[in-house]
């Protein structure tokens, strides 16, 4: 999986703190609001985005009421994400404004509305992976990277 951009420093639970692990950040939990580490922990992440751990820093762990006691300092990036798009937009290297396509097949939901991307995101098409069908139409499955505005 490709990753681009600057690494973000954050904290994750000790059990998740391994390179290659991906997670979706859903927003701060109640205990985070009064935590002195919230700025570096949840303050650097955007709710609803997918992150991939690149590196675990060799620093001491910190106590946390949410993560079974301990969190570790890690470097994360937003990874590339696979999404189905209109074939006319599928040009490798191009930047498009993401417009989700409707698909009634619940098993393909993750391809048509993947977690980590939002309608209207500006994304760069990294690679065209193939075709995917839904509702009698053929779409292109592409790997994209979100472009931060």
Curated annotation (Swiss-Prot):
Q: Which residues cross the membrane?
A: none
- Quote the InterPro entries the UniProt record gives: UPF0179 (IPR005369)
State the family it belongs to.
Answer: Belongs to the UPF0179 family.
Q: What is this protein called?
A: UPF0179 protein TON_1048
Lineage, opening ranks = Archaea, Methanobacteriati, Methanobacteriota, Thermococci, Thermococcales
